């Protein structure tokens, strides 16, 4: 269920500060964050945010279509290696 409109979007304060500083200085370096739960705001468009997936930080270039989604949606946490083939079927 989506968040109530009267509450507004959730974003961690430390991430919001980093985004404001990067936008003010016109800094292009990636912003490293562990906050997968934060929502993407219009102020983040054009910035690169390195989102932690549990093992490493995945760089995500924020575009206008991403506004309103959460950062964690763009950094996959699981790797799919395919189904294991049956050894008897190969013979």
Swiss-Prot record:
It comes from Teredinibacter turnerae (strain ATCC 39867 / T7901). GO terms for cellular component: cytoplasm; small ribosomal subunit. GO terms for molecular function: rRNA binding; structural constituent of ribosome. This is Small ribosomal subunit protein uS19. SUPFAM superfamilies: Ribosomal protein S19. Disulfide bonds: none annotated. InterPro entries: Ribosomal_uS19 (IPR002222), Ribosomal_uS19_bac-type (IPR005732), Ribosomal_uS19_CS (IPR020934), Ribosomal_uS19_SF (IPR023575). Belongs to the universal ribosomal protein uS19 family. Keywords: Ribonucleoprotein, Ribosomal protein, RNA-binding, rRNA-binding. GO terms for biological process: ribosomal small subunit assembly; translation. The keyword rRNA-binding applies.
